[in-house]
């Protein structure tokens, strides 16, 4: 079974009433461990790659590790996802490099700019059969290089969410 999209996975999970684990990976041992566990329980999985993992382990090596997991476990649905891609170029690189899902996280930008970047990623991704997740608001907490306080938190309202559903 080749890599699958998260759209396919989520549809089956919703219909079957189960959740799907998403695991950040950055080396062979992590990919092997997660893959072996998924095989044992016959569970689909999302293998995620962060900006930091791409810097640490190299994009090509990570893609090849996930391709090896697909070969070793042909019975397990596996999606390859970019976690918190900071810009269009990173998302494009992952789409062109074989990822089946990307997350654009331009939440550190002004809202209107975030929307435009997200729109550009969505158009490019959909032209290539890739699913997109987007962080349009900003939740309190720390993730990678971004720290958002409670007072800076921006949640996206219903009217905006309905435009993207």
Predicted regions and their residues:
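Active-site cofactor/substrate anionic-group-binding motifs, chiefly glycine-
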Residues: 40-95
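N-terminal amphipathic alpha-helix/helix-capping segment at the start of soluble metabolic enzymes
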Residues: 1-21
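Active-site beta-loop-alpha junctions enriched in small/polar residues
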Residues: 25-28, 50-52, 83-87, 107-109, ...
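Conserved small/polar residues in nucleotide/adenosyl-binding loops
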Residues: 153-160
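Glycine-rich tight-turn/loop motif centered on a GG-T
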Residues: 18-19, 48-59, 99-117, 144-152
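Hydrophobic faces of well-ordered beta-strands that scaffold small-molecule active sites
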Residues: 20-24, 45-49, 78-84, 102-104, ...
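Active-site-adjacent beta->alpha loops and helix N-cap segments on the catalytic face
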Residues: 32, 56-63, 86-93, 107-130
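Short, well-ordered coil/turn segments that N-cap beta-strands
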Residues: 16-19, 41-45, 74-78, 98-100, ...
């Amino acid at each position: 079974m080749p890599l699958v999209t998260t759209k396919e996975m989520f549809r089956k999970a919703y219909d079957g009433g189960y959740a799907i684990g998403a695991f950040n990976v950055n080396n062979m041992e992590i990919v092997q461990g997660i893959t072996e566990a998924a095989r044992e329980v016959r569970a689909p999985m999302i293998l995620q790659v962060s900006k930091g993992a791409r810097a640490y382990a190299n994009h090509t090596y990570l893609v090849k590790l996930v391709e090896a997991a697909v070969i070793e476990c042909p019975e397990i649905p596996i999606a390859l996802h970019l976690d918190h891609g900071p810009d269009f170029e990173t998302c494009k690189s992952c789409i062109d490099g074989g990822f089946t899902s990307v997350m654009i996280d331009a939440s550190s930008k002004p809202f209107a700019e975030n929307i435009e970047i997200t729109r550009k990623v969505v158009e490019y991704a959909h032209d290539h059969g890739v699913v997109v997740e987007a962080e349009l608001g900003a939740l309190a907490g720390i993730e990678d290089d971004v720290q958002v306080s409670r007072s800076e938190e921006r949640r996206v309202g219903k009217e905006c969410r309905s435009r993207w559903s």
